[in-house]
């Protein structure tokens, strides 16, 4: 029986998570992409604690962008997560694409986070 798209993404994400772990020295930058929005979190997996978060749902971004499902929204979220991470003293992260293909909105967020100063 064929898996649904969501189930296939979740199984890919579990496979990735077995290898990608965030530490306090190098936390994990986790990306979740829904149909309408994109979310990013910097997570310390040893303490199970979210250090920094940003999404296209935030009021300041929603006013500027309108739709949260575009590459422009992903770029804005990537810049915002990098800015917040730098303010929290985080410079190096491990990228977790969340089972999504590294293309389009996920790639745009990653590139913007790199341009913002995060190293991964």
Swiss-Prot record:
It comes from the Bacteria. This is Large ribosomal subunit protein uL18. Pfam families: Ribosomal_L18p. Belongs to the universal ribosomal protein uL18 family. This is one of the proteins that bind and probably mediate the attachment of the 5S RNA into the large ribosomal subunit, where it forms part of the central protuberance. PANTHER family: 39S RIBOSOMAL PROTEIN L18, MITOCHONDRIAL (PTHR12899), LARGE RIBOSOMAL SUBUNIT PROTEIN UL18M (PTHR12899:SF3). The keyword Ribosomal protein applies. The gene is rplR. Gene3D superfamilies: 3.30.420.100. CDD domains: Ribosomal_L18_L5e. One of its GO terms (molecular function) is structural constituent of ribosome. GO terms for biological process: translation.
